[in-house]
Amino acid sequence: MRNSEEQPSGGTTVLQRLLQEQLRYGNPSENRSLLAIHQQATGNGPPFPSGSGNPGPQSDVLSPQDHHQQLVAHAARQEPQGQEIQSENLIMEKQLSPRMQNNEELPTYEEAKVQSQYFRGQQHASVGAAFYVTGVTNQKMRTEGRPSVQRLNPGKMHQDEGLRDLKQGHVRSLSERLMQMSLATSGVKAHPPVTSAPLSPPQPNDLYKNPTSSSEFYKAQGPLPNQHSLKGMEHRGPPPEYPFKGMPPQSVVCKPQEPGHFYSEHRLNQPGRTEGQLMRYQHPPEYGAARPAQDISLPLSARNSQPHSPTSSLTSGGSLPLLQSPPSTRLSPARHPLVPNQGDHSAHLPRPQQHFLPNQAHQGDHYRLSQPGLSQQQQQQQQQHHHHHHHQQQQQQQPQQQPGEAYSAMPRAQPSSASYQPVPADPFAIVSRAQQMVEILSDENRNLRQELEGCYEKVARLQKVETEIQRVSEAYENLVKSSSKREALEKAMRNKLEGEIRRMHDFNRDLRERLETANKQLAEKEYEGSEDTRKTISQLFAKNKESQREKEKLEAELATARSTNEDQRRHIEIRDQALSNAQAKVVKLEEELKKKQVYVDKVEKMQQALVQLQAACEKREQLEHRLRTRLERELESLRIQQRQGNCQPTNVSEYNAAALMELLREKEERILALEADMTKWEQKYLEENVMRHFALDAAATVAAQRDTTVISHSPNTSYDTALEARIQKEEEEILMANKRCLDMEGRIKTLHAQIIEKDAMIKVLQQRSRKEPSKTEQLSCMRPAKSLMSISNAGSGLLSHSSTLTGSPIMEEKRDDKSWKGSLGILLGGDYRAEYVPSTPSPVPPSTPLLSAHSKTGSRDCSTQTERGTESNKTAAVAPISVPAPVAAAATAAAITATAATITTTMVAAAPVAVAAAAAPAAAAAPSPATAAATAAAVSPAAAGQIPAAASVASAAAVAPSAAAAAAVQVAPAAPAPVPAPALVPVPAPAAAQASAPAQTQAPTSAPAVAPTPAPTPTPAVAQAEVPASPATGPGPHRLSIPSLTCNPDKTDGPVFHSNTLERKTPIQILGQEPDAEMVEYLI
């Protein structure tokens, strides 16, 4: 029918889930046996002929079945929630499995097989029958983590065993555990005493027909398996958390007879489970029977006991009072064939017999309660059941016992029933007794049918009540399921979290250890690395210092090289400029040479004319001599006459001449004073002009800088424009600064030259003031020679050109020195510098003859004295020399009184009457005859004519009044001894025209050429000449060391010279600078 069709499907689903979870999460060694169990479970039927193994047709009452199907469906819906933490339960199970094995043992293979067969057979088992599944399991059969109502602990029994098991149990599957909990909780309320069909309608009725209560059931669960006496029984209530306290207290009725011991033994003794199934369909026993034939029930119970149906123990417990019926009722041969096929027969029983079975149990219970003396027999029967229980456990430990092997237990239990054999009687008594029994049984059957009708009504009412109770229990079961699921989830999560926390603690501890180790290693590495880096840094510092030193050294060398390069470039530029200047000067000198050649030709002609003039002069002198002698005679005669007649006019004339001379001297002194004042004011003017020029330059520089700053800070101009402007400004500033520097140097040298000139003028004036009386005495006997040009002009021209050559000796330098030297001070050595030689270009234009500006005569004529050796670089041309009148008053050819060297200076004057007045004392004051008398510059024209003809050697040589005013000067260093007279250049009167020849300018000794006079001022002391350089002198600059070149202030009018090394220097003429006539006049 419908129930029978749905039973295999529903039970197989639950079993398959359990097996799948076990195969998935369980021990791999048990998977093979579980697969075999699953194959047996999904087969045609169980291998054992169990009473509950092959269920027959069930009742058609649908209300309990539908209710149970709803329950199963609800459990199936709730099961997947428990699978969410199955992996966590497996982890916790593995962690806690050693702890659980100490208290409980896992089920063996046979026990597991029995349980699986039970779950397959009891597919839609009622909650009452399923409750005993968990309750029947002893310590061996209980799987780990399944809650059991009965805990068989040998020591103590905790009252909260279920709670402790819930907290401590290790769940293999949460859904399996929750299903068993729900079955267990419902099983306490619905306790069927005897049934083989799990969902038969009388099953809930039997619970209320049973006089025993759940409290008595729990009372009997405490004793150990080896306790068989009633005294060992203890009254135990249900565990604290199980909902069985509110049951009806029916145990008060059954407690004096202690029927709970009967249930306790059958709870503990599983082999006697199917006895009730054997005796279930027997006729009711006689009420007053002594029931001696219990031994028959024992072999039958042993024969029918199967280890696969836990429900058989419940049926045996409910049907045990029926086993106490008389043996005549049990030994009928018609009922014994039911034993082997009792399961099949019970499946085909009609419904009234199935309903009669609980009634039998009820009547048996009343009969058992009416006979209190049967407690001893019950005790013996319990002992026998206990023996069968041990025997059945031994059979369960054998692997895979066949169903037929269960009958081997029958002969062991038969000898124990010997004491219950019936007493033999005669056949009449037996027949009469049988008739009585038939009557009694018929009456009893009639009564029992009436009772059965009443019981049907009660059962109907009780089914309604049970339906309500089942609904309530179902609701309660749902609550328990949800709460248990929630608690299990919470516990699983708590366990999982605790395990995770422990794992994280361990992991954290390991990480701390690793961190400490890593820190130590890192510290060691850092220390080693720091040591290495310190060493490396120290080495790098040392190398850096060395490299810095090398860099500084290289930078210094580079700066030096740059400065040297710049100097070389500047020198190259200067030399290029000087070369161009020299080339220009060479061209100019060639032009001048042509002009001078013309002059030479003219001079030759003039010399020829001079010779003629000399001849004419000699004739004229002779005539004059004659005339003079005649006039003297006349004068003497006139004087004699005047003395005799009147002498006053002569005195007046002499007085007039002396007064005129005194007046002339005063005028000349005043002129000199005025000229000195004019020079002073000119110097002040120049200084102020220089300062004004400096101020203007500084203002221009500041303005240029300000303009450059404004341009550089202007936001409209770009960086490139500002940079170009700045570079251009800097270049202009550099050029301007160089130009200003050159101008300053020139001005400084000009001022220095002016100072020297003024010093010379002062000395000349001092000497003139001393020598004025002697000059007046000598000039009183002289008269000017107006037929010839003044010797003062010639002398001044000669000396002025000498000073000009001193200021710019580049012509002589070009002629004599091939290794040209620049004129800047940085290119000159210390020994090449003279005291009075300027080392920078002088603003005074060189190579320009200084024009004489004589205040008295106003003559600007220049007598030219030149030599022919210019083209052969042997001699130097003596340019025209101009000497101002006040300077020319001093004697230029001073007698040199030096003890180390005596310089003979010979100056041949063309004009015989233009001999200086101081030349005679100079010649007379010479210490030895070797001292040459020099014909130097003459004094003012007024005093020039008073010099006598025989005043000096030079005057004798220059007797011709019309001779040219040329002088050949030769300077030669001599020994400390006085130079003999032949060392002098004898210039006879007829040979005065050849005085300028090169042959007459040679010294008798091969001495180096003399340098020009270093003083830039027109000093009237030395006239210069150039001697041809000997081979020993070389092409270098020719110098003349003059240790002491002094003029005797007592004898001559020349200045005192203190010069160590006289050098020819080549001051560079600034390009584009023209000669300044006014400056030349001022210097003159």
From Swiss-Prot:
Residues 24-86, 185-205, 224-268, 300-424, 837-876, 995-1041 are annotated as: Disordered. A motif (PDZ-binding) lies at residues 1081-1084. Residues 429-689, 721-751 form a coiled coil. There is a cross-link at residues 594-595 (Glycyl lysine isopeptide (Lys-Gly) (interchain with G-Cter in SUMO2)). Polyubiquitinated by NEDD4, NEDD4L and ITCH, leading to proteasomal degradation. Residues 309-332, 393-403, 995-1010, 1020-1029 have a biased composition (Low complexity). GO terms for cellular component: actin filament; bicellular tight junction; cell surface; cytoplasm; cytoplasmic vesicle; cytosol; endocytic vesicle; external side of plasma membrane. The modification Phosphoserine is found at residue 714. Residues 854-867 have a biased composition (Polar residues). Keywords: Cell junction, Coiled coil, Isopeptide bond, Phosphoprotein, Tight junction, Ubl conjugation. GO terms for molecular function: angiostatin binding; signaling receptor activity. Pfam families: Angiomotin_C. InterPro entries: Angiomotin, Angiomotin-like, Angiomotin_C. One of its GO terms (biological process) is positive regulation of blood vessel endothelial cell migration. Component of a complex whose core is composed of ARHGAP17, AMOT, PALS1, PATJ and PARD3/PAR3. Interacts with MAGI1. 'Motus' means 'motility' in Latin. The coiled coil domain interacts directly with the BAR domain of ARHGAP17. The angiostatin binding domain (871-1005) allows the binding to angiostatin. This is Angiomotin. It comes from Homo sapiens. The lineage of its organism: Eukaryota, Metazoa, Chordata, Craniata, Vertebrata.
